[in-house]
Amino acid sequence: MEIRKLSLSTIRSIITSLSVLVLVISASATLVRSTPPNVLEQVLASGELRVISTNGATTFYEGSDGLTGFEYSLLKGFADSLGVNLAIENQADTRELLHAVEQRQYHMGSAELTALESQDYHLSFAKPYMQITQQLVYNHRLGTPTSIKDLKGKEVLILADSAHSKRVARLQKKFPNLTWRPIENGQMIDLLEMVHKGEADYAVIDSNAYELHRYSYPRAKLAFDISNPQPLAWAFPHSKDTSLFDAAQRYMAQIKRDGSLAQVTKHFFERHIDEVTTGEAMVFAYRLQNRFPQWSDAMKSAATEFDLDWQMLAAIGYQESHWLADAESHTGVRGLMMLTKRTARAMGVNNREDPLQSIYGGAKYFRMMLDRLPERIQGDDRLNLALAAYNQGAGHLEDARVLTQRMGGNPDKWEDVRKYMPLLSKSQYYSRAKHGYMRGWEPVQFVDNVRNYHKIIAWHEQQNELRLASYSGGALSSLHKAPTETAAQGENLSL
């Protein structure tokens, strides 16, 4: 084969072309490498969503099982949807929080933020997760105000440096005779407590805060809204890179569509306590603080031994005796848990007026009532049916379940059983029952009352946790990093 010789100029031309090609390829590679990942890609790569928030009742706090709270649950759900951990840092000062988000020190901010209080910052807000209004509350001993004009010459508390102060500034121009007293470094719960105790006549608080704390402060009554609904939403740094913002928008749309948002909102804010009047709630709250503590350790110990909820056991004790060790009824039951002679003997209780024996006997008996129910009955139905049995005996409960089935209801569902149980006080029904007559309305009321007292006890317990969380948060440095989700197990909203 003949090999043609290349001229020197041709060789130089080829070398030059190859050099140019190498430079082009190198430049292209450098260009590709120099394109930074977007914010969402950065979050996914780091495995962590960094959020700045404010430690408090409606945002996040340390519960018995780790971090929890309304906004925490939403944030945890968002982080889970991305497959990353959630890291929350606490910042008590809203202005500092907004500034930190604006400066991209965090991926996002979540602390009951409204556009009104954030208008001085360059931020983008996602779809709102809640609408709130600013509401006037008043002490119950006063007449109910019906409009702003009724507050002429009165002093109204507000939180300093909040959306309220901006709203008040506008109201003062329209109503110059109003007197507003700003409270520095306070929280909604502080204003509500001051009104409840009579230390203040009026205050302006957010509607979600009122809903959350209303049963703890029954003397603070709701008057009217003083603002239009304001949307609460997550805040993001304003940027052309909307990757994480868009992901949040999709997540918020999803949880609204599938009902998850409504579910978590109900869990944290809807605390319906039916048939407990304001007076009864106040008496109960007083006794919870002044009478119950002496039995608290025994209740918790007995509940642990018999695998019960101590708050439920305490609620039973209150319904039975108002936590009085020497209580006695006209039917002969006595003691803190109001045991009959036969029940006390079966539970190994020698002295029904011995509060420790009574508590342990009551706990053992309630556990027995729970265990006697068919395994297929679970959840609230199991609890409620066991409570009815505790009150009237397992035999009467079985009669009620048989009657319920005969009447076309479901004997495993408390809502059906409670409907037919009162019929067993009528001869046409109890004459056919194995265990005869029963005061059929009593177990229904018993269950309702116990469940209501249980809600109040659980609510007060949560309030203690919230208050500890709030003030422990304030005692920390102004910017305190909370644990990440590697260990914390809070309210989970996974999609």
From Swiss-Prot:
Endpoints of the signal sequence: 1-29
GO terms under cellular component: cell outer membrane
SUPFAM superfamilies: Lysozyme-like, Periplasmic binding protein-like II
Broadest EC class assigned to this enzyme: lyase
Subcellular location: Cell outer membrane
EC number: 4.2.2.n1
Keywords: Cell outer membrane, Cell wall biogenesis/degradation, Lyase, Membrane, Signal
Gene3D superfamilies reported in the protein's UniProt record: 1.10.530.10, Periplasmic binding protein-like II
Region LT domain: start-end pairs: 274-495
CDD domains xrefs: MLTF-like, PBP2_YfhD_N
GO molecular function, a single term: peptidoglycan lytic transglycosylase activity
Family matches, as Pfam families: SBP_bac_3 (PF00497), SLT (PF01464)
Chief localisation class: membrane
Cystine residue pairs: none
Topological type in the membrane: Peripheral membrane protein
Chain intervals for the UniProt region annotation (Non-LT domain): 30-273
Residues at the catalytic site: E320
Catalytic reactions on record: Exolytic cleavage of the (1->4)-beta-glycosidic linkage between N-acetylmuramic acid (MurNAc) and N-acetylglucosamine (GlcNAc) residues in peptidoglycan, from either the reducing or the non-reducing ends of the peptidoglycan chains, with concomitant formation of a 1,6-anhydrobond in the MurNAc residue
Family according to the record: In the N-terminal section; belongs to the bacterial solute-binding protein 3 family. In the C-terminal section; belongs to the transglycosylase Slt family.
Role according to the record: Murein-degrading enzyme that degrades murein glycan strands and insoluble, high-molecular weight murein sacculi, with the concomitant formation of a 1,6-anhydromuramoyl product. Lytic transglycosylases (LTs) play an integral role in the metabolism of the peptidoglycan (PG) sacculus. Their lytic action creates space within the PG sacculus to allow for its expansion as well as for the insertion of various structures such as secretion systems and flagella.
Swiss-Prot/TrEMBL domain comment: The N-terminal domain does not have lytic activity and probably modulates enzymatic activity. The C-terminal domain is the catalytic active domain.
Protein name listed in UniProt: Membrane-bound lytic murein transglycosylase F
Organism of derivation: Cellvibrio japonicus (strain Ueda107) (Pseudomonas fluorescens subsp. cellulosa)
Gene: mltF
